[in-house]
């Protein structure tokens, strides 16, 4: 396998401490329940991913590595490839070239969208999708990972463990005092937290979050940063965001995309002072 370098020569920061690792096993295979090899501490690995739409190269030999438990921010101008990258990871878009591995052996490019979600990857889009006529508690109940059909889960009594799990997630997303409130009456920020809670009910290992604080108040944005920091470690988070103050509050590694590949990586201060980033992204 080629060395993990993007076309600009930027080595994904997530690999710096694993010099002997040459990437995932070449015999990547379809997911089987309970199987996720994190022996090299990398949960997501994109290897030379390229995607073209009608001659436009949305991704150009993109290489990216995300550590297990990491909180990573992805920034870049419009058209940099951020959404296409998320689409490839979740199976919505098939790459023309390259591989996308979940852990050491699971090749996401060979899986369907439902299989990828079941494997432990959750995605949140910018606009929240919730059941507005049901309470916050009921929304989490519906999202719980159960071997039941949706209509049945509405009427089946929760076990004590299931009730406790819903209650724990409500506290985690700071909606425990809004448990019986119809979701449609929640504020915009609270709706975003509720959808994140619905993802958490699925027990994902990796969360993909697309502009999660768009439209939030300053207070909601601050609380969201605190939530994400608290989730890191148990979960891995990839956050696509334009709000630099929010990115700064998260305090993690930042990857800058440009024209479908990695332009720079580092903490926010480092990438903000990178001359290439200044020229193509910050406009200075």
What feature does the model see in each segment?
Residues 99-118:
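ABC ATPase NBD Q-loop/coupling interface
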Residues 207-211:
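Catalytic Walker B motif of ABC-type/P-loop ATPase nucleotide-binding domains
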Residues 1-50:
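ABC-family P-loop ATPase nucleotide-binding domain
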Residues 109-110, 169-190:
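Conserved ABC nucleotide-binding domain
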Residues 90:
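Helix-to-loop junction immediately C-terminal to a conserved catalytic motif
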Residues 34, 153-178, 226:
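Conserved ABC ATPase "signature" region
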Residues 75-77:
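The feature captures the beta-strand-to-loop junction immediately N-terminal to the Walker
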């Amino acid at each position: 396998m080629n060395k993990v370098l993007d076309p600009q020569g930027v080595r994904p920061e997530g690999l710096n401490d694993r010099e002997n690792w040459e990437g995932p096993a070449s015999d990547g295979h379809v997911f089987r329940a309970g199987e996720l090899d994190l022996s090299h501490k990398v949960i997501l690995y994109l290897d030379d991913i390229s995607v073209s739409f009608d001659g436009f190269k949305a991704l150009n030999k993109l290489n990216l590595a995300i550590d297990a438990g990491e909180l990573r921010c992805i920034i870049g101008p419009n058209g940099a490839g951020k959404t296409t990258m998320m689409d490839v990871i979740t199976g919505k878009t098939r790459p023309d070239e390259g591989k996308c591995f979940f852990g050491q052996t699971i090749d996401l490019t060979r899986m369907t969208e439902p299989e990828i979600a079941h494997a432990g990857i959750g995605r949140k889009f910018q606009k929240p999708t919730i059941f507005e006529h049901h309470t916050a508690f009921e929304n989490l109940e519906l999202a719980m990972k159960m071997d039941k059909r949706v209509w049945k889960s509405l009427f089946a009594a929760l076990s004590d463990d299931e009730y406790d799990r819903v209650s724990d997630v409500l506290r985690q997303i700071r909606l425990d005092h809004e448990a019986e409130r119809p979701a449609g009456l929640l504020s915009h920020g609270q709706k975003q937290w509720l959808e994140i809670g619905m993802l958490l009910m699925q027990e994902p290992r990796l969360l993909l979050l697309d502009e999660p604080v768009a439209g939030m108040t300053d207070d909601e944005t601050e609380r969201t940063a605190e939530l994400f920091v608290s989730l890191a470690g148990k979960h891995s988070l990839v956050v696509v965001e334009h709000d630099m103050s929010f990115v700064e509050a998260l305090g993690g590694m930042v990857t800058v995309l440009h024209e479908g590949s990695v332009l720079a990586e580092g903490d926010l201060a480092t990438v903000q002072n990178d001359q290439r980033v200044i020229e193509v992204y910050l406009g200075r």
